[in-house]
Design a protein with these regions (language model features):
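Active-site-adjacent scaffolding segments
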Residues: 1-10, 34-38, 65, 72-74, ...
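N-terminal intrinsically disordered/low-complexity leader segments
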Residues: 1-20, 192, 200-211
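Helix-turn-helix
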Residues: 24-27, 31-69
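Hydrophobic/aromatic residues within well-ordered alpha-helical segments
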Residues: 67, 74, 78, 102, ...
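Hydrophobic alpha-helical connector segments
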Residues: 73-76, 83-114
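Amphipathic alpha-helical interaction segments
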Residues: 97, 101, 105, 118-121, ...
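Amphipathic alpha-helical segments used for helix-helix packing
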Residues: 107-130
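Hydrophobic/aromatic-rich alpha-helical bundle segments in the mid-to-C-terminal region
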Residues: 129-140, 146-211
């Protein structure tokens, strides 16, 4: 194998230098998570993702084939990241309530722009013939983790999921801009993020952000 096998020519991403194909794939998926999360599946093009990743659009198509396959790759990566964060929180060996630690881990994923939103986007695509089954399977995996691995009761698992969906909604609405301006939304944001409101205000997407 040559020293440069598996690397993408510089022309694929002007101004970025050589990068391994695996690293370039990770870069594209991270951009896809952010852009799909903000603009949705229908509203996003492969060119949008390419520009966000500073990659040529033909290379994105060459690597993933279609927008559908790119979305599935981004969704799969997001689900694996989510479940890995839950498992790490559950098994960290530190004292404390497992649900609280997993909840904190979920909030910590806000640093990965678009992760919460792409999950919400996927969960609204149940009628899609390809994405729908994948989204349902992913949601079922999360439920099984909460029940079987984390040992939550059915009621606790439902409440955990409900809070997660509320958090996703607040992030998707880019509601943090209302903090301190609207009393009701300030109260709700404080309730959703009681221990991490400062971080959320700093990290969450805001109105006007491209993603």
């Amino acid at each position: 194998m040559s020293a440069h096998e598996g690397e993408i020519p510089d022309a694929a991403a002007p101004g970025i230098g050589r990068m391994s194909s695996d690293a370039r794939r990770e870069q594209i998926i991270a951009a896809a998570v952010a852009v799909f999360g903000a603009k949705g599946y229908v509203g996003t093009t492969t060119d949008d993702v390419a520009r966000a990743a500073s990659i040529s659009q033909p290379y994105v198509v060459r690597l993933f084939g279609t927008k559908e396959k790119l979305f599935l790759a981004a969704l799969g990566d997001s689900l694996e990241t989510l479940l890995r964060a839950f498992a790490d929180a559950k098994n960290d060996g530190r004292p404390g309530d497992v649900q609280e630690k997993m909840g904190a881990a979920y909030l910590g994923l806000i640093e990965m722009r678009g992760l919460h939103q792409i999950l919400s986007q996927a969960f609204m695509l149940g009628a899609h013939p390809v994405i729908g089954p994948t989204a349902r399977a992913g949601f079922a995996r999360v439920w099984r983790f909460l029940r079987d691995d984390a040992g939550m009761s059915a009621d606790d698992a439902r409440q955990f999921l409900a809070m997660g969906m509320l958090i996703n909604t607040m992030l998707g609405l880019r509601m943090t801009g209302e903090y301190g301006r609207d009393a009701g939304m300030t109260e709700l944001l404080d309730g959703c993020f009681p221990e991490s409101i400062t971080t959320v205000l700093e990290e969450a997407p805001r109105v006007g952000d491209p993603w």
